[in-house]
């Protein structure tokens, strides 16, 4: 279970540094945007709902791509929205500070889009059902999220450190994510045409501490309410094993497993 109060605090604290460190999130964003560019022309007058807009990176790209659209952008971190509002190309955007899981929608949208956000939801299926109800016929719901292979090196190193020290409890080093098949099952919605694709980005860092620092700087540290690592000696063992087992030619490696989903709402046949 995600602790939303803690998560909100971390994202507010990371607002200033987010864009500098969100390299993978930007790659994921452009994969989503390429789907929209194939589907709509720049003259399209469409209603767009963006969820988890953060500092407005995707928001601004949407505004540039579809200048005749109206965009509603939502995030629950006030500091993130404050930065998004300072971007140059957001004149056709209305910002709202709300929790996606408590969002009450009153109109329908042609496009509902979210980049690297839905992994922070406690009930993804319920959110998808709510969003699908407010999607126009032939509209598209598309989002990216992180998959179960994300940070596999970190999880493997932590598990090996526990085994080395004969620790058998359920402590973890970070959040676990859905597999492609699990996500596909969750996204099966009546009258919806679902497509799921995946890719892995391998990022390199000079040392493990630099990698963990980059995670903190985008606010993405563990916000689960469950048990997590609080032992300094176990943490040091994990760092040592990570650098021993997962160092490549360009430094230590970190896998980001990205899942891309787009669902088209079909009319009655």
Swiss-Prot record:
<dbReference type="InterPro" id="IPR025714">
    <property type="entry name" value="Methyltranfer_dom"/>
</dbReference>
<dbReference type="InterPro" id="IPR011814">
    <property type="entry name" value="BioC"/>
</dbReference>
<keyword id="KW-0489">Methyltransferase</keyword>
<keyword id="KW-0093">Biotin biosynthesis</keyword>
<comment type="function">
    <text>Converts the free carboxyl group of a malonyl-thioester to its methyl ester by transfer of a methyl group from S-adenosyl-L-methionine (SAM). It allows to synthesize pimeloyl-ACP via the fatty acid synthetic pathway.</text>
</comment>
<comment type="similarity">
    <text>Belongs to the methyltransferase superfamily.</text>
</comment>
<dbReference type="GO" id="GO:0032259">
    <property type="term" value="P:methylation"/>
</dbReference>
<protein>
    <recommendedName>
        <fullName>Malonyl-[acyl-carrier protein] O-methyltransferase</fullName>
        <ecNumber>2.1.1.197</ecNumber>
    </recommendedName>
</protein>
<dbReference type="GO" id="GO:0008168">
    <property type="term" value="F:methyltransferase activity"/>
</dbReference>
<keyword id="KW-0949">S-adenosyl-L-methionine</keyword>
<keyword id="KW-0808">Transferase</keyword>
<dbReference type="InterPro" id="IPR029063">
    <property type="entry name" value="SAM-dependent_MTases_sf"/>
</dbReference>
<dbReference type="GO" id="GO:0009102">
    <property type="term" value="P:biotin biosynthetic process"/>
</dbReference>
<comment type="pathway">
    <text>Cofactor biosynthesis; biotin biosynthesis.</text>
</comment>
<dbReference type="Pfam" id="PF13847">
    <property type="entry name" value="Methyltransf_31"/>
</dbReference>
<dbReference type="GO" id="GO:0102130">
    <property type="term" value="F:malonyl-CoA methyltransferase activity"/>
</dbReference>
<dbReference type="GO" id="GO:0010340">
    <property type="term" value="F:carboxyl-O-methyltransferase activity"/>
</dbReference>
